[in-house]
Amino acid sequence: MQALDGHLHVTGKSGYIARYRAPQNSLSYPGDAACAQDASCHKVDSGQYAGDFWEGNTSRDQYTGWFFGMAMAYDLIDDEPTKQMIATDVAEVVHALMADYWWIVDVDGQPTTAGPNIMSPMRATWLLIAYHMTGAADFKAQLQSLLTDKARLGYDIANIDIMNHYTQYYGNNLSHTTWYNLLRLGKVYFSPADYQWFVESFDQHETFTRLSHNAWFDEIYMSQGPYAPANPDPYQTQLVDDLTDFFAAPNVEYALPARTNFTMDPMSELLNYLMTEIPFLQQIMGNVQPQALYAFPVPQQCAGDFLWQHNPFVITACGNDNPEHTYPGVDYLIGYWLAEYHKFVTKDM
C-alpha cells in the first residue's frame, strides 16, 4: 500500500498518480536515463521521494489498477492507519478528477495524451469506491447522477467491446477489473433495480471472454455475474485447468510456434481483408490479424507480463526462448487468490 500511496504523492500534484515510480539509477530499469529527453520523465531531488524518478502521461489504465488495489486492500485489512491512508488517497484522486471534469490532467496543466478521459463505468466505480470509504456527500451526489435512467446510454456506449475481441485485447482486462468492484459494491449500495441493470449489462457485454481460458475473467464473472453452477460445470472445470496449466516459476519468456490445429474465426478474416483494402480503417480501429474461433489453453498462449490481458486467440508464432527475461507472476497470483477468496478452489488443491 505504501507503493500505491507513493505513486500518488511522488508527482507533487494533488490527485495525480504516476504511471511508474522507481529509484534513480535502478539496475532493474534505468528509466531515468531518458529524463533529459522525455518530458514525461521526472527526477525527484528533494523531499520525501528524493532519489526517485517517476513517469507521467498517466492513462485511465493505470488509474484502473490503482483503484482496484486500493479498494480490495481497504476491505481486506484491519490496520486502521493504513485504511485511513487509503481512504484519504482515494478521496484526493476522485476530488481531483471531479474538479477537472473527469480528465486526467498532468503536471503541465494539460490532459495527458494517453487515455485521459474517464468514461461512465470507471467514473461510477471510482465514485462508489470513494463513497464506500468516506461516506462523503459530494461523492454520493455525483454517483447518483450516474444512476439515472438517462445516464445508462453512456454505459452502453462505453461498454461496446466487439473490437476488443480482435484488437487492443487488454481493454477486456480494464473492463473486467472495473466491473468487479462496480458489481461487488453496487450489490451493497445500489437499489435492487439499478444493481440488476448493471448485472444484466455485464452479462450482455462481456461474452466472448467467457470460457476463453482466462481464469481472471471467469472468476470475475463467476463471483459477480449471473453465474449459475451447472453439473458438470464448464466454468469450474476450465478455471481449475487454467490455474493448473499455468507455467511453473520462474515464469520466463518462451518461444511459441504458430498454432496448427484450430478453426479460423471468419469475422477476423473479414476484418483483416477490409483493413487491407481500406487502410484508414486500421488507423481508426487498430490492426486485426486472422485468429482462432476458440481460445487456446494456457500452454498455447503467448508469453506476456500479465497473461490475462493478452489475446488467447492468436495463431501466429510469438515470443523468444529467453531464460533471462522473467515475468513477475502476478497474473497467476491474482488468478489463484481470487479463486481461493471466492471458494472456487481450496488451498489443498
What are these regions (language model features)?
Residues 2-116, 120-121:
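Extended ligand-binding groove/face enriched in aromatic
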Residues 1-7, 90-124, 130-349:
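Ser/Thr/Asn(+Pro)-rich, low-complexity disordered segments
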